[in-house]
UniProtKB/Swiss-Prot annotation:
Family of the protein in this entry: Belongs to the cytochrome b family. PetB subfamily.
Gene designation per UniProt: petB
GO biological process annotation, one example: photosynthesis
Cellular compartment(s): Plastid, Chloroplast thylakoid membrane
Subunit structure: The 4 large subunits of the cytochrome b6-f complex are cytochrome b6, subunit IV (17 kDa polypeptide, PetD), cytochrome f and the Rieske protein, while the 4 small subunits are PetG, PetL, PetM and PetN. The complex functions as a dimer.
Signal peptide boundaries: none
Residue stretches in coiled coil: none
InterPro entries xref list: Cyt_b/b6_N, Cyt_B6_PetB, Cytb/b6-like_sf, Cytochrome_b_N_euk/bac, Di-haem_cyt_TM
UniProt keywords, alphabetically: Chloroplast, Electron transport, Heme, Iron, Membrane, Metal-binding, Photosynthesis, Plastid, Thylakoid, Transmembrane, Transmembrane helix, Transport
Gene Ontology molecular function: any one: metal ion binding
Role according to the record: Component of the cytochrome b6-f complex, which mediates electron transfer between photosystem II (PSII) and photosystem I (PSI), cyclic electron flow around PSI, and state transitions.
Protein name: Cytochrome b6
The species this protein was found in: Amborella trichopoda
Binding annotation for heme b 2: 86, 187
Cellular component aspect of the GO annotation: chloroplast thylakoid membrane; membrane
Length: 215
């Protein structure tokens, strides 16, 4: 086993990387509120795991979506638990994200030289809200249907581009199969990919610049 480790160590300097990760200085003013971002990340990872598990059984069609969710809840082994954890962690992720944004703002974590960290964080907050909107429509129940109809109908009040924008969001003039397909694609592929990209930008900047000092 040591020979295998030595082989990787010689090429990748694993020990140096581990030492850098574990020996990072933590300022004395750091408290539990500085963990909110990490909790948000944990919730996201739970979302990815449970969401991936449900894609094996969920059917993104207007005729089968609701029935497939019911099947997950009643027939799939531990399906009720997986979906429940997905919903609970989604709510927790949004709450932790909001608290994290407030903590960073109130402690001045957005100021120079951390402007780009703040910008990527705001983008991640928007992506988190988008997860909520797109995910809400997937069960294709009454609450999800009317929520999506209202949310996608909001841009219609914008002069000139309002109606085309609504049609772009829905895929048609009304909420239907095209809307569900778009929201499913956004929820399971586009948004997770964008979130991963911005996290890979966000975390190295935090690592490089460190935690902002006390007020």
């Amino acid at each position: 086993m040591s020979k295998v480790y030595d082989w990787f160590e010689e090429r990748l300097e694993i020990q140096a990387i581990a030492d850098d990760i574990t020996s990072k200085y933590v300022p004395p003013h750091v408290n539990i509120f500085h963990c909110l971002g990490g909790i948000t990340l944990t919730c996201f990872l739970v979302q990815v795991a449970t969401g991936f598990a449900m894609t094996f059984y969920y059917r993104p069609t207007v005729t089968e979506a609701f029935a497939s969710v019911q099947y997950i809840m009643t027939e799939v082994n531990f399906g009720w638990l997986i979906r429940s954890v997905h919903r609970w962690s989604a709510s927790m992720m949004v709450l932790m994200m909001i608290l994290h944004v407030f903590r960073v703002y109130l402690t001045g974590g957005f100021k120079k030289p951390r402007e780009l960290t703040w910008v990527t964080g705001v983008v991640l907050a928007v992506l988190t809200a988008s997860f909520g909107v797109t995910g809400y429509s997937l069960p294709r129940d009454q609450i999800g249907y009317w929520a999506v109809k209202i949310v996608t109908g909001v841009p219609e009040a914008i002069p000139i581009i309002g109606s085309p924008l609504v049609e772009l969001l829905r895929g048609s003039a009304s909420v239907g199969q095209s809307t569900l397909t778009r929201f499913y694609s956004l929820h399971t592929f586009v948004l997770p990919l964008l979130t991963a990209v911005f996290m890979l930008m966000h975390f190295p900047m935090i690592r490089k610049q460190g935690i902002s000092g006390p007020l």
